[in-house]
Amino acid sequence: MEFLPLFHNLRGSRVLVVGGGEIALRKSRLIADAGAVLRVVAPEIEAQLSELVVQSGGEMILRGYSESDLDGCVLIIAATDDEPLNAQVSHDARLRCVPVNVVDAPALCTVIFPAIVDRSPLVIAVSSGGDAPVLARLIRAKLETWIPSTYGQLAGLAARFRNQVKGLFPNVQQRRAFWEDVFQGAIADRQLAGQGAEAERLLIAKIAGEPPPETGEVYLVGAGPGDPDLLTFRALRLMQQADVVLYDRLVAPTILDLCRRDAERVYVGKRRAEHAVPQEQINQQLVALAKQGKRVVRLKGGDPFIFGRGGEEIEELAVHGIPFQVVPGITAASGCAAYAGIPLTHRDHAQSVRFITGHLKDGTTDLPWSDLVAPAQTLVFYMGLIGLPVICEELIRHGRSADTPAALVQQGTTVNQRVFTGTLANLPQLVAEHEVHAPTLVIIGEVVKLREKLAWFEGAQATV
């Protein structure tokens, strides 16, 4: 190990930065974030750096570097493009035994800056010893995606009760076991879900020796329209810690594969007019599994609150006092339209958009057709394939032009995506000609014309 990682408390201490340009600004921001007082020396100092110095309560010296500039400083940074000057700053700092960093010159440094993941008070540093800084930044980027921002709040919660726990458990091993249980259980789950008050209540109860609640938790997770890359970080994290996963027909296998490998998987998919599992039974199943102390992911295609019946499921959970979280997903309308190259709103074509269920009941749909034919709006029909002839006929009958552009997006956002464009008049015919099947989204409006020049994603087939 060439460099020993250490964390320095610079709050209120003076740090010298030699240089007044972009590189100096970048380093100074990091130093100022740590609460240091900046002393910047350079013949010219750019405006943003000047503002930063003032905010830190520091000083600007508008001249060339002098050895006396090191007086009273606990850290020195050379951030110029003048190599001889950088070498001189390094030499002077070493003589005084003051830590020095020279940007992009590891041989002149006694300290180096790592790539930092800041979840204060939790801070993670990644360093290559100056040999491969780009690699260190890439690793940091991966860590940023894996570690939720709420981990800082979790660390803060632990800090507030650290002394109390230390008094309760004088033995180091006992304290370690206590905190490991906290960070891997319901308390951490509540804090990471943004339920800080509940997390603190559970921690206080645990310190008091109260038995932990036996009830598990339900995570209502939106899986998005199909592309696994469109999952949120939180969705992925909860999927990987679930004991049981209840999933729908619209959840792609590639997304299901991202769940914890040993999790029990229960299919509760639905098709039109045929429910594999009745909704009431799904609700009861969620309650029963949570009461067994299990962490349950209810995985739904798209967004659980947009034609996903998620509201009904969490209502049942609330009645039984089951803790739950809701993780939004990218709904099919926005995901499929984006991948089809169809903006749902556009200044020249549509100032509003409506999401509508296209399910038929007794051969018709009970919709406000007069409102749906208003100009300058986009209509997006979910589950509208079976009822498409009725939808097109009613829109035309109520005044929408038969030449209105329209599109069918089948299996949008996936490698099997197919897009067919036409008009209200011939859209049902396109379904028959191209054997279009569910899941398919219907988009109606002038914005569909933009697909001709905005299409970017190549699926299995695209017909214009």
Swiss-Prot record:
Keywords assigned: Cobalamin biosynthesis, Lyase, Methyltransferase, Multifunctional enzyme, NAD, Oxidoreductase, Phosphoprotein, Porphyrin biosynthesis, S-adenosyl-L-methionine, Transferase
Catalysed conversion reaction: uroporphyrinogen III + 2 S-adenosyl-L-methionine = precorrin-2 + 2 S-adenosyl-L-homocysteine + H(+); precorrin-2 + NAD(+) = sirohydrochlorin + NADH + 2 H(+); siroheme + 2 H(+) = sirohydrochlorin + Fe(2+)
Listed pathway(s): Cofactor biosynthesis; adenosylcobalamin biosynthesis; precorrin-2 from uroporphyrinogen III: step 1/1; Cofactor biosynthesis; adenosylcobalamin biosynthesis; sirohydrochlorin from precorrin-2: step 1/1; Porphyrin-containing compound metabolism; siroheme biosynthesis; precorrin-2 from uroporphyrinogen III: step 1/1; Porphyrin-containing compound metabolism; siroheme biosynthesis; siroheme from sirohydrochlorin: step 1/1
EC number(s) per entry: 2.1.1.107, 1.3.1.76, 4.99.1.4
Family annotation (InterPro entries): 4pyrrol_Mease, 4pyrrol_Methylase_sf, 4pyrrole_Mease_sub1, 4pyrrole_Mease_sub2, CobA/CysG_C, NAD(P)-bd_dom_sf, Siro_Cobalamin_biosynth, Sirohaem_synt_dimer_dom_sf
Domain of life: Bacteria
MF term (GO), any: precorrin-2 dehydrogenase activity
Gene3D superfamilies: Cobalt-precorrin-4 Transmethylase, Domain 1 (3.40.1010.10), Methyltransferase, Cobalt-precorrin-4 Transmethylase, Domain 2 (3.30.950.10), NAD(P)-binding Rossmann-like Domain (3.40.50.720), Sirohaem synthase, dimerisation domain (1.10.8.210), Siroheme synthase, domain 2 (3.30.160.110)
Region ranges (Precorrin-2 dehydrogenase /sirohydrochlorin ferrochelatase): 1-203
PTM-bearing positions, type Phosphoserine: S128
Binding site for S-adenosyl-L-methionine: P225, G301, G302, D303, I306, T331, A332, M383, G412
GO BP, sorted A to Z: cobalamin biosynthetic process; methylation; siroheme biosynthetic process
Active site location: D248, K270
Region (Uroporphyrinogen-III C-methyltransferase) location: 216-464
CDD domains assigned to the protein according to its UniProt record, in alphabetical order: SUMT (cd11642)
Binding sites annotated in the UniProt record for NAD(+): E22, I23, P43, E44
Pfam families: CysG_dimeriser (PF10414), NAD_binding_7 (PF13241), Sirohm_synth_M (PF14824), TP_methylase (PF00590)
Family (UniProt): In the N-terminal section; belongs to the precorrin-2 dehydrogenase / sirohydrochlorin ferrochelatase family.
Function field: Then it catalyzes the NAD-dependent ring dehydrogenation of precorrin-2 to yield sirohydrochlorin. Finally, it catalyzes the ferrochelation of sirohydrochlorin to yield siroheme.
HAMAP family assigned: Siroheme_synth
PANTHER family per the UniProt record, alphabetical: SIROHEME SYNTHASE (PTHR45790:SF1), SIROHEME SYNTHASE-RELATED (PTHR45790)
Protein name per Swiss-Prot or TrEMBL: Siroheme synthase
Lineage, opening ranks: Bacteria, Pseudomonadati, Pseudomonadota, Gammaproteobacteria, Pseudomonadales
